[in-house]
Amino acid sequence: MSMFLDTAKISVQAGRGGDGMVAFRREKYVPNGGPWGGDGGKGGSVIFKVDEGLRTLMDFRYNRKFKAKNGEKGMTKGMHGRGAEDLIVSIPPGTTVRDAETGKVITDMVEDGQEFVVAHGGRGGRGNIRFATPRNPAPEIAENGEPGEERELQLELKILADVGLVGFPSVGKSTILSVVTAAKPKIGAYHFTTIVPNLGMVRTKSGESFAMADLPGLIEGASQGVGLGTQFLRHIERTRVILHVIDMSASEGRDPYEDYLQINKELETYNLRLMERPQIIVANKMDMPEAEENLKEFKEKLAANYDEFDELPQIFPISSLAHQGLENLLEATAELLDQTDEFLLYNEDDMEQEEVYYGFNEEERPFEISRDDDASWVLSGEKLEKLFVMTNMERDESIMKFARQLRGMGVDEALRERGAKDGDIVRIGNFEFEFVD
């Protein structure tokens, strides 16, 4: 049996765009050939793709870094560099992708074949053929390729099941799953026999089918991490109907009704929205002594805690071991599923706001100025830093162009306002230059 892994932290890095080329056309009979340097190719993106054949995040246990290839450099004769192929990373259905730094949900991937770009490849730098103007017909300017997007991601697998079996350990959840589906969960007469979720397909006599998950047993304090804690509570979130399994024989000395209240409390504490899901109470082990009396007492306590006009949850007495009462339970479950819509897993506050990768917010200041300990001025900011890394600092014309761009952004004026003097050191990353007033 393969090891079950339902969380992983990984890093992804898209490819850098290829550098543009500085070249000139030098051919016989072609005087003043002009610029001929082509653009660099686009860097490869990192794309997640859902593969329904995968069931866990085990592939990410040892392989935690994913890096796409860089685009090729531009070439002479105005030829563009080849764009790099995208890196396709397969993930199981039901995977939620979060930004590890902010915790925001980037995407929730559930459909087979669904794709999502988690890191965009950098744009290729422009060659000098792009910078020719009537005033400068032979520019020695070309851009470096844009760096690819890089980010840390948190992956969470929440299995795709229509129905979830919940309850205390050893109440018979795994036995129910093994009887009504072809799944073969581990079954034993001790607590926490089930330590990973098990999934099976149910088919009723009337022809209805649905996916059922047996989740590891919950105990008091599970929502705070006691026992197996929240490690597997996340798998209940995608279910539409909850089958609340209770040991009606009270074989371990617990009160069945107190068990019922305690499990609901844990579900509510973990995620209030779990209590929106309809529940069917499964009174298991009805073939045991005192089960009938306990069920009668359970119903009385349940009714006493509901208002007169509230609808009581359905209760189905069964014996999974003796295969009694299961058909009625499954038919009722299928009927309830038909009446229940899917629940919204995340609201807008959970989701990361989608942004245009190459765009900039007009309202945001394109740069920031700070003072270092050595009295030098430090320039930072996404737009400014992107212009810097795409500037070829080995060519004078490119440096002059970058200086004009800084002036156009208002950097010179802002430095003067902050008190910068002629000859002061200004730093962008590891690059230093003198401020000229």
Swiss-Prot record:
HAMAP family, sorted: GTPase_Obg
SUPFAM superfamilies: Obg GTP-binding protein C-terminal domain, Obg GTP-binding protein N-terminal domain, P-loop containing nucleoside triphosphate hydrolases
Pfam families recorded: DUF1967, GTP1_OBG, MMR_HSR1
Keyword Hydrolase listed: yes
Region annotated Disordered, chain positions: 127-146
Domain of life: Bacteria
Record key words, sorted: Cytoplasm, GTP-binding, Hydrolase, Magnesium, Metal-binding, Nucleotide-binding
Function field: An essential GTPase which binds GTP, GDP and possibly (p)ppGpp with moderate affinity, with high nucleotide exchange rates and a fairly low GTP hydrolysis rate. Plays a role in control of the cell cycle, stress response, ribosome biogenesis and in those bacteria that undergo differentiation, in morphogenesis control.
One function term, GO molecular function aspect: magnesium ion binding
Protein name (database record): GTPase Obg
Gene Ontology cellular component list: cytoplasm
Organism for this UniProt entry: Streptococcus thermophilus (strain ATCC BAA-250 / LMG 18311)
UniProt KW Metal-binding keyword: yes
Necessary cofactors: Mg(2+)
Localization, UniProt: Cytoplasm
Domain OBG-type G: 161-338
Binding site for Mg(2+): S174, T194
Record-listed E.C. numbers: 3.6.5.-
Domain Obg residue range list: 2-160
Family named by the database record: Belongs to the TRAFAC class OBG-HflX-like GTPase superfamily. OBG GTPase family.
GO terms (BP aspect): ribosome biogenesis
Transmembrane segments: none
Binding site for GTP: 167-174, 192-196, 214-217, 284-287, 319-321
Subunit structure: Monomer.
Residue intervals of the OCT domain: 359-437
